[in-house]
């Protein structure tokens, strides 16, 4: 996508972090927006920031873990704007916890928001983009955790590896069908967001505060670690420019932390040389 002015973007997870700065960056570039999030008070702030920039914007409060909610948000966007040129699936959470400790409901939550919300939006929006008969783009926000593995977060890795793989496979399908939609996957490292506030947005269907896991040392240490690495991550103020430059250049993989590239290379090397995961590769990093 070379020209953003007057194009229509649909973005999830727009109340905080990447979603907020990307949405505001889109407004700066003259785009029209549908912004979606479960956190209505915070979403209203993003909405006002975009209005202040003079952009046309629709705000939809929705739980994107539910397919019907995603369908309704897309329908509202189409009613207002009549098209979607850029879909950004950004909604996501992080839940630390080893596989034998993390409650099943947490696995269900993270897979539904980090993966299935992307599936729901793509299933609904790709047919719309095809019918438009004009160029369109889809960007799925995954993580460096979708390219390399680390200890302590198997649910997060599972969801992000799945997002990367799904995006790659969809790119093949679109190319084979000669459909003019370009796919992109963003795999950021640690960035200064409020991702460690995941618990503030937990839907009731995934909540059980009486579960002893949430008072366990493992859980509390995981929360502390998540807060530390995120608050000490890369400043977020360059993310919007990174995203839109990548879209202009039609880059498929959008990486924000080149210092992690050796970890990606090491993982591929281990795969092709019959190597095995070695926790010591994380020494000095995690």
UniProtKB/Swiss-Prot annotation:
Catalytic residues?
A: 156 (proton acceptor)
Question: Looking at the record's lineage, which domain of life comes first?
Answer: Bacteria
Subcellular localization: Cytoplasm
Q: In which pathway does it act?
A: Lipid metabolism; fatty acid metabolism
Q: What is its EC number?
A: 1.1.1.-
Query: What's the family?
Result: Belongs to the short-chain dehydrogenases/reductases (SDR) family.
Q: Please state the gene responsible for encoding this protein.
A: cla-dh
Naming one, the record's GO cellular component terms include: cytoplasm
The entry's keywords: Cytoplasm, Detoxification, NAD, Oxidoreductase
Q: What is the recorded name of this protein?
A: CLA biosynthesis dehydrogenase/reductase
Q: Which reactions fall under this protein's catalytic activity?
A: (10S)-hydroxy-(12Z)-octadecenoate + NAD(+) = 10-oxo-(12Z)-octadecenoate + NADH + H(+); 10-oxo-(11E)-octadecenoate + NADH + H(+) = 10-hydroxy-(11E)-octadecenoate + NAD(+); 10-oxooctadecanoate + NADH + H(+) = 10-hydroxyoctadecanoate + NAD(+)
Protein source organism:
Lactiplantibacillus plantarum (Lactobacillus plantarum)
Protein's GO biological process: fatty acid metabolic process; response to toxic substance
* One Pfam assignment: adh_short
What is known about what this protein does? Answer: Is involved in a saturation metabolic pathway of polyunsaturated fatty acids, that detoxifies unsaturated fatty acids and generates hydroxy fatty acids, oxo fatty acids, conjugated fatty acids such as conjugated linoleic acids (CLAs), and partially saturated trans-fatty acids as intermediates. CLA-DH catalyzes the dehydrogenation/reduction steps in the production of 10-oxo-(12Z)-octadecenoate, 10-hydroxy-(11E)-octadecenoate and 10-hydroxyoctadecanoate during linoleate metabolism.
Quick check: keyword Cytoplasm in the entry? yes
Q: What's the main place this protein lives?
A: cytoplasm
Matching Gene3D superfamilies: NAD(P)-binding Rossmann-like Domain (3.40.50.720)
Which Gene Ontology terms cover its molecular function? oxidoreductase activity, acting on the CH-OH group of donors, NAD or NADP as acceptor
Residues where NAD(+) binds: 37, 63-64, 90, 156, 160
